[in-house]
C-alpha cells in the first residue's frame, strides 16, 4: 500500500495563462521531483527514499481542486504556489479556490503545515486577491531588476518555503550555508556562489570558515548548526591537500550535517579518495550554473526534514527522537550527548543504507551505556 504523502506542492494558475505558467510549472516539477532509480533487485531491504512521499499537483479548474480538497485532509504539509493573474481573480469559480487557500493558510497560523507563495503578474490581481496573498508574495522580487522572476528562482524560493513548513527554524528564515573551499583554486567559485545566494530573495545567509573560530568553538558551532545548515564542499584539485578543508568536511560529515559536494576538479574522472565524498550528493556544473548547487543544497536539507517527519510517524510520541543522515562517529556521538538539553533524546535513528552493520552494532552498544542510555535504531524499522 502506498504511504501517505509527507508533503504536497500545489501549483494553481488559470488555464488561459498556460503559456505564462508553463516554464514555472516545469521548474517547480524539477525542483520537487523524485530521482528515477533503476529497479532494485537486491535481496537486501529497499533503501528509504523520502522524496517518494512528495507530491506535485497542478490545479487549473475548480473541479480538480474539489477532488484534491476531498483527499487532502490527511496531507499534513502543503505549499500552495499561486500564479496570480487578472484572469484568475476574475474567474468566479477560481476565486472560490483562492478563498479556500486563504482559509487554510489562515487556519495554519497556529498549527502550521500549510503556507502560500504568491507570484503576481499583475498589481490589479494582487489587490483583488484575498489579503493573505499580498502578505505571502515573493519577497523583494522588484530588486531582481526584472518584470518577471526567472522560473528556476521561483523553484528555489518554493524549496526554501518548504523547509519552513517541514520544521526548519523560522528565526532567521534565511538558509544558512557553510561553504568549504580551498582559497588556492576555489575562492572565485565560492564568490560566484555567494553572489548567486544574494540574487535569490530569502536565501541571503552566507557561512564561511572566517565566520567561525577554530578549535572547540568551531566544533561546537558545527554541532549546533548540524540540523539547520547545509555544508557545501567545493572539491577543487587543491581541496584534499588543505588540512583545514578536510577537518571541516569530516567534522560536518560525522555530525550528520546535510552536505553537498560540488565536483570542480579539472579532470572529469578522479581516482580513489580517503575522504568519503561519494557518501553525500555530488554535483558537477561544467556550464557554471551555480543555481543547481543551491537546488541540491535545499533538497538535501529538506531530505533531513522529511526523515524527521518519518521518524515522527514511526517512533513513540512520548520518546523524543533524533535523526542522523549518516551514522555518527563515536567522537560525534560524545559531542552530541554533551549538547543534549535537560530532556535528552532517547532514540537516535539512522538510514540503514548509510551504515555498516558492525559499526552500527558497536555504536548501539556504546550508547546503551550512556547516562541516560540512548537507543539506536534504523529509521526504516523504528516503530
PLM segments and residue spans:
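Glycine-rich, charge-decorated loop segments at or immediately adjacent to ligand/cofactor-binding or catalytic sites
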Residues: 123-137, 218, 267-282
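Short secondary-structure boundary motifs at beta->alpha junctions and helix caps
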Residues: 134-149, 278-292
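Catalytic core segments in nucleotide and nucleic-acid processing enzymes
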Residues: 237, 249-251, 259-267, 277
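Conserved N-terminal substructure of TIR/SEFIR domains
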Residues: 1-84, 94-104, 109-112, 122, ...
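Nucleotide-sugar-dependent
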Residues: 238-243
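Short glycine-/small-residue-rich Rossmann-like dinucleotide-binding loops
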Residues: 85-86, 236-237
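Leloir-type glycosyltransferase catalytic cores
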Residues: 283-307
